[in-house]
Amino acid sequence: MLLLLAEYLQQFHKGFAVFQYLSLRGILGVLTALSLALWLGPWMIRTLQIRQIGQAVRNDGPQSHLSKSGTPTMGGALILSAIAVSTLLWADLSNRYVWVVLIVTLAFGAIGWVDDYRKVIEKNSRGLPSRWKYFWQSVFGLAAAVFLYKTAPTSVETTLILPFIKDVTIPLGVGFVVLTYFVIVGSSNAVNLTDGLDGLAIMPTVMVGGALGIFCYLSGNVKFAEYLLIPYVPGSGELIVFCGALIGAGLGFLWFNTYPAQVFMGDVGALALGAALGTIAVIVRQEIVLFIMGGIFVVETLSVVIQVASFKLTGKRVFRMAPIHHHFELKGWPEPRVIVRFWIITVILVLIGLATLKLR
């Protein structure tokens, strides 16, 4: 939006041409979203408290979590609002990738909003039935996958890239739709499962989102892409503005979500942010790198799958409780220790993911 204004004002002063630089608009995206989140955060928390929109805590979880009952939830709406406003202000709105990621993010946020709303109204932690949640996730995930497949100008945008391996790619064809569906929906649910402790999900999301922003910037520049042997995806560089907005909004939210949390993001935030990461990774052809950098999300998801499968097959549980962050809590780890150690692991995994740019 402001990019169009800057383009118009260039005829009066050439200095406005500076807004053509992606790096500047990415930074402005961070600062705008961060400012909005910090400014609106206290108001949103008060509003949630007045409306008694509080978190319902399961009785079968860690006993230390019972004190969290009633903490304002649905704070993810703050994150999404800051991301949307910042992106609309600083991104090139003629870029199709910007709209794909923004629409997918808001669509999954809407699913999470309904889920959270039902939890608040019914005063339980179950929310929207799983079958309906997965149904609507599948609808939006498949819609995004089909759109990206149908509008891909070259086969490069539907080819699987293997990190660490030079000149080896796998043409997916229609299989691209299937892979994209699983990446978007899987990432959405993985972040949601991770969002069980104060600040546990948002900081890894910010770190992975920032790293994906680097991939977007490099993939959208033909010279960088050729030098680093990564796919050149014209227009993908514009997503650095969205990634910047995600970083700013996430850090602003963390200000209120850090232990002990004043507000939880709820499914409205977790489902949306996970879907956003998955969609961006698909666009820049870095699905496997997302799997590496988001290792915490992957482990959290696998712990649930293993726990359920083990109990159904043998009647025994592998972990004291799943997702795995609760397992460590029940082993006696204080909540802040679990959170920070998971953050440290994410830093390491993100660095490994970024290393794939050169190690080929």
From Swiss-Prot:
Coiled coil: none annotated. It is a multi-pass membrane protein. The keyword Cell inner membrane applies. It catalyses: UDP-N-acetyl-alpha-D-muramoyl-L-alanyl-gamma-D-glutamyl-meso-2,6-diaminopimeloyl-D-alanyl-D-alanine + di-trans,octa-cis-undecaprenyl phosphate = di-trans,octa-cis-undecaprenyl diphospho-N-acetyl-alpha-D-muramoyl-L-alanyl-D-glutamyl-meso-2,6-diaminopimeloyl-D-alanyl-D-alanine + UMP. One of its GO terms (molecular function) is metal ion binding. Its EC number is 2.7.8.13. Keywords: Cell cycle, Cell division, Cell inner membrane, Cell membrane, Cell shape, Cell wall biogenesis/degradation, Magnesium, Membrane, Metal-binding, Peptidoglycan synthesis, Transferase, Transmembrane, Transmembrane helix. GO terms for cellular component: plasma membrane. It is found in: Cell inner membrane. GO terms for biological process: cell division; cell wall organization; peptidoglycan biosynthetic process; regulation of cell shape. It holds the Pfam family Glycos_transf_4. The chain crosses the membrane at residues 25-45, 73-93, 97-117, 134-154, 168-188, 199-219, 236-256, 263-283, 288-308, 338-358. Its main location: membrane. It is an enzyme of class 2 (transferase). Its cofactor is Mg(2+). Catalyzes the initial step of the lipid cycle reactions in the biosynthesis of the cell wall peptidoglycan: transfers peptidoglycan precursor phospho-MurNAc-pentapeptide from UDP-MurNAc-pentapeptide onto the lipid carrier undecaprenyl phosphate, yielding undecaprenyl-pyrophosphoryl-MurNAc-pentapeptide, known as lipid I. Belongs to the glycosyltransferase 4 family. MraY subfamily. This is Phospho-N-acetylmuramoyl-pentapeptide-transferase. It comes from Pseudomonas putida (strain ATCC 47054 / DSM 6125 / CFBP 8728 / NCIMB 11950 / KT2440).
